[in-house]
Amino acid sequence: MKNKLPPFIEIYRALIATPSISATEEALDQSNADLITLLADWFKDLGFNVEVQPVPGTRNKFNMLASTGQGAGGLLLAGHTDTVPFDDGRWTRDPFTLTEHDGKLYGLGTADMKGFFAFILDALRDVDVTKLKKPLYILATADEETSMAGARYFAETTALRPDCAIIGEPTSLQPVRAHKGHISNAIRIQGQSGHSSDPARGVNAIELMHDAIGHILQLRDNLKERYHYEAFTVPYPTLNLGHIHGGDASNRICAWCELHMDIRPLPGMTLNELNGLLNDALAPVSERWPGRLTVDELHPPIPGYECPPNHQLVEVVEKLLGAKTEVVNYCTEAPFIQTLCPTLVLGPGSINQAHQPDEYLETRFIKPTRELITQVIHHFCWH
């Protein structure tokens, strides 16, 4: 029953107080099971049907889908339940205690983005879900901050095809319809060690990597020349050499060298296309030194994303907000949800607060966010 639902600020407080950190390091990684249970119980109290989905390949992580209404289409509101780890020495407040001060709500996940579920639940107090003409879905995912495993698995397995979706990442309530993707690779070269007094008796991995880097930088230039999307601040795919290590002593021929790099592709560029371009760029080195160069993914790749600018979702949201949709450089789960239906990224709080100590959400977002959620539910589920 709706009268069992706690007040907005108490929902927010409970979400922040329930740790759900995602990390690649096992010692820091946490299950989101307790948070999913909280959300599931609240949505059941509102009359939703709730399904909890274990996410394979994770450390006890779950998705939750709450649904109400019948028929095809409808609206999907989505967000992730996890947060990044926190640096205790840089926080001046308890990350797991919601603190209100000077027009701000402080806590880990206030902006990015557990707080979004408090807004949804609060808005639903005034919605008679028994009168919806189209279904309403609420999706809570796992592991967005690391592998995006929750959104990937949900998109791969669901038969759901809503009319549209909104992901409540912190965009300062400015609608986002496109972003770049992210691919990170390790280029590894196996040389042959030996004494530096006789270089010809070994294979210097640093020298081979020097050759490989030349070809990678040529690929960077080619990407800049061939691909353009003028709406982006940086209107071409970027390629960055981020980390390199090789060798262990000045008097030894280097037997191993490793380079970490990333590419941020534009919407419309496929992951297979990018992998092909990278492998083609490195082919001269691989052919000259068979078996010595490998390319491995550091993280699961994220494709670029774009919602059609003429879709009804874009038109409706732009009219409601009085603001045009934007494109951004950071990544979200939108590429995976977009495989199900046209998707926008739109939520309270600033992306500048994401992953920061003393993360906060400004209270000025509370009223307009609640109103926006109510309006989009009315438009897409009642009309």
UniProtKB/Swiss-Prot annotation:
Q: What is this protein called?
A: Acetylornithine deacetylase
* Species for this entry: Escherichia coli O157:H7
* Metal-binding as UniProt keyword: yes
Does this entry carry the keyword Cytoplasm? Answer: yes
**Which InterPro entries does the entry link to?**
AcOrn-deacetyl, ArgE/DapE_CS, Bact_exopeptidase_dim_dom, Peptidase_M20, Peptidase_M20_dimer, Peptidase_M20A
Classify the source by domain of life.
Bacteria
Q: Which NCBIfam families match?
A: AcOrn-deacetyl (TIGR01892), PRK05111.1 (NF003474)
> What does the annotation say about its assembly with partners?
Homodimer.
Keyword terms, alphabetized: Amino-acid biosynthesis, Arginine biosynthesis, Cobalt, Cytoplasm, Hydrolase, Metal-binding, Zinc
Q: Which pathway does it take part in?
A: Amino-acid biosynthesis; L-arginine biosynthesis; L-ornithine from N(2)-acetyl-L-ornithine (linear): step 1/1
Class of this enzyme: hydrolase
Coiled-coil residues are none
PANTHER family, alphabetized: ACETYLORNITHINE DEACETYLASE
Function in brief: Catalyzes the hydrolysis of the amide bond of N(2)-acetylated L-amino acids. Cleaves the acetyl group from N-acetyl-L-ornithine to form L-ornithine, an intermediate in L-arginine biosynthesis pathway, and a branchpoint in the synthesis of polyamines.
Membership in a protein family:
Belongs to the peptidase M20A family. ArgE subfamily.
Q: Tell me its cofactors.
A: Zn(2+); Co(2+); glutathione
- A GO term from the CC aspect: cytoplasm
Binding residues annotated for Zn(2+) 1, in chain numbering:
80, 112, 169
